[in-house]
């Protein structure tokens, strides 16, 4: 049997080490997409506009309610949801200030005084703006998928809030949010499908 010379053995070891490194890097790339990478990707987009269609299943009424309208956000902390159908409503949040409008009437309050709304707003706003600190403070967060197609599962850390909103799942492609699913503790659930407006997507 032909014996490897010391030089050849050295080359073989270096080649094996490089191959092992490539395999490890590939495995890390495939399995390592996490919240830090996702929020970094999302934070590059500083503003956006989209249309939405939402279907909400209300168990008490045994029916599904549909609505549609427009969404907008501006980093670092502004989120606007304007419902156009079946009736005009507007929800605008900047920082901790929530303004709700219905027709010509409007009401302004602190976001944290409306816990159910706060959980949903913070889940969507925090994801849109790539605010990892806010998401980690308020939720147990789990990312699945890849940078090209991902899902972010959020469960409120506060047990009292979890008694109202069981979980939120935000899904998207690249740096664009495309769907938000909300499961309330009473069994009601909603799915909001989001379509970026031309020129608004990254």
What spans do the regions from the language model cover?
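An acidic-aromatic
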Residues: 70-122, 190-191, 196
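Short, solvent-exposed helix-to-loop capping segments enriched in aromatics
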Residues: 42, 119-134
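Gly/Pro-enriched, hydrophobic low-complexity segments
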Residues: 109, 132-202
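N-terminal secretory signal peptides and thylakoid transit peptides that target proteins
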Residues: 2-20
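Hydrophobic h-region of N-terminal signal peptides that target proteins for export
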Residues: 21-32
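N-terminal mature ectodomain segment of secretory-pathway/periplasmic proteins
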Residues: 37, 43-95
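Short hydrophobic/aromatic-rich beta-strand segments that constitute the beta-sheet cores
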Residues: 52, 79-82, 98-100, 152-154, ...
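Short acidic, glycine-rich loop/turn motifs
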Residues: 56-58, 83-85, 102, 156-158, ...
């Amino acid at each position: 049997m032909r014996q490897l010379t010391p030089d050849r053995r050295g080359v073989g070891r270096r080649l094996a080490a490089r191959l092992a490194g490539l395999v490890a890097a590939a495995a890390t790339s495939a399995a390592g997409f996490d919240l830090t990478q996702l929020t970094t990707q999302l934070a590059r987009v500083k503003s956006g506009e989209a249309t939405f269609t939402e279907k909400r299943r209300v168990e008490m009424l045994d029916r599904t309610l549909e609505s549609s309208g427009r969404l907008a956000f501006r980093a670092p902390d502004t989120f606007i949801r304007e419902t156009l159908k079946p009736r005009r409503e507007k929800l605008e949040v900047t920082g901790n200030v929530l303004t709700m409008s219905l027709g010509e009437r409007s009401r302004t309050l602190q976001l944290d005084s409306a816990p159910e709304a706060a959980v949903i707003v913070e889940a969507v706003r925090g994801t849109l703006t790539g605010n990892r600190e806010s998401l980690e403070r308020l939720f147990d967060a789990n990312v699945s998928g890849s940078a090209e197609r991902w899902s972010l599962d959020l469960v409120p850390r506060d047990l009292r809030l979890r008694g109202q909103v069981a979980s939120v799942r935000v899904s998207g492609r690249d740096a664009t949010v495309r769907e938000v699913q909300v499961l309330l503790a009473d069994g009601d659930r909603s799915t909001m499908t989001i379509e970026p407006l031309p020129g608004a997507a990254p």
